[in-house]
Amino acid sequence: MQLDLSRFSPAERSTLQLRVLYEGAGYRKFRCSHFEEYSLYQQNERFLSDSQVITFTDLDGKLRAIKPDVTLSIAKNAQPAAGECKKYYYTEQICRPSRESHTFSEISQMGLECIGAIGAAEQAEVVRLALESLASLEVPTVLEVSHMGFVTALLDTLHVDAAARPRLLELLRDKNAHELHAAALQSGLDEAAANALTTILSLHGPFGTTLAAARSQCQCEAQRDALLELQSLQNELGDAGRGMQLDLSLAGDMEYYNGLVFSGYVAGVPRAVLKGGRYDLLAQRFTPGACALGFALYLDELERLSAPLPPVQQQGTERQWLNIALPKGRLGDKAYGLLAAAGYEANENYNETRKLVVENPEAGVRYFLVKPSDVAIYVEHGAADIGI
């Protein structure tokens, strides 16, 4: 009897297909408890995306936590011998705070981890599996690749204070050129140094041409070494790396990632569905000298591929609407004023109407007037195209 995969949701299909892919590449299934001793997360808090976890006192009196992360559990248990490389894949649920709802939420993940002796071949294999994981979704996808060494080497060369770095990296990730330049000046950099940091935002696009552009902007040997590693990755992958682009502004958490980082995107989903990178510092907390590389695919995000569009986005081909979520208050008023001056005013008086949705059919623009805290939720769930 042949299995009809069309009856499954995108996340269910991916789970079945990727299990075959990962096991064929030599990865073994890793199973872990839903709980870990809280001390594991307390001692490694800097490696967590959020320090908030749900804790409880178990029947034996020990303080435990509902698992917010799978990688920590694998790194703790892998313990590879010298020269050994251990390969695991997993399908697990984790529990993390949601920035949108301000509550804890369950997140379904499928991913893999490669821990131990990792060379250029092993690194290329993990990236190839990330590319094939995205390709299995059968929708347009792209994998954006970067290297933490390129960014951190520039910060070192510019003598950026350690306290200022997390904010600068956040602005790099957000591709916020204006705020990045201002924050760089505020951190003590001069105009030339601030411009050098902001220029990283232009280093994205096709792998080969972006790599060439980045070489011309290197200010130290460590940056050149990072680009050599990226060139080596491209050479190892060959034709298998066709779905890969380079984005050197893709900076991960400095406490976690120390080399290659990458994010995967699919058409129809507003944020990354796959994230991964090199995390030697975490692996070495449990196994001295070990290297580590892996990624996670966020299965919940894949369900968007089969979900019906919100009514406001069920558009015909005759007209395309731009749906904008505006916060009530002065920020929303200012943003609306700029848009109205550009010809995108609503047909009703924005400041006098009690309606929560106003629009201009001629201009093809629709505004949702929402609480500031709800702007991100409207965009996350696809009700609005952009939020301000």
Regions from the PLM with identified roles:
Residues 1-4, 216-219, 268, 359-364:
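Short, basic, glycine/proline-bearing loop/turn elements
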Residues 7-25, 36-37, 71-82, 89-140, ...:
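Positively charged, Gly/Ser-enriched RNA/tRNA-binding surfaces
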Residues 28-32, 243-244, 341-349:
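Short secondary-structure junctions
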Residues 52-98, 372-387:
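Glycine-rich, N-terminal phosphate-binding loop and its surrounding beta-alpha-beta segment
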Residues 316-388:
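Domain-level signature for soluble enzymes in the chorismate/prephenate branch of the shikimate pathway
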